Amino acid sequence: MISKIDKNKVRLKRHARVRSNLSGTAQKPRLNVYRSNKHIYAQIIDDTKGVTLVQASTQDKDFENETGSKVELSSKVGEAIAKKAADKGITEIVFDRGGYLYHGRVKALADAARENGLQF
């Protein structure tokens, strides 16, 4: 019998492997991305303190009336997180794609964040 591969389990193993070498500091915090079937979430984290500095997602009040494809909304979340980070004085980050492939919604979020001033 053929067993079905649990894609989320594989993603979590990949994410744990990457996180062992990747950490955010106060000077260069970590931009973490989580993707569900319907929404995308991004947060900038200082791992030394264990504190979320800035967050943005498609469930924020700013996105209540937004329409468009999931890729377009992801790029708008990237813009929002970059603007919120700039308000807090954060310009350099470490990008944590959360074990997802750098493609589609994750890539759109990262590109929009770069275009709006975040360096990684």
From Swiss-Prot:
It comes from the Bacteria. Gene3D superfamilies: 3.30.420.100. InterPro entries: Ribosomal_uL18_bac-type, Ribosomal_uL18_bac/euk. GO terms for cellular component: cytosolic large ribosomal subunit. Transmembrane segments: none annotated. GO terms for molecular function: 5S rRNA binding; structural constituent of ribosome. Part of the 50S ribosomal subunit; part of the 5S rRNA/L5/L18/L25 subcomplex. Contacts the 5S and 23S rRNAs. NCBIfam families: L18_bact (TIGR00060). This is one of the proteins that bind and probably mediate the attachment of the 5S RNA into the large ribosomal subunit, where it forms part of the central protuberance. Belongs to the universal ribosomal protein uL18 family. This is Large ribosomal subunit protein uL18.
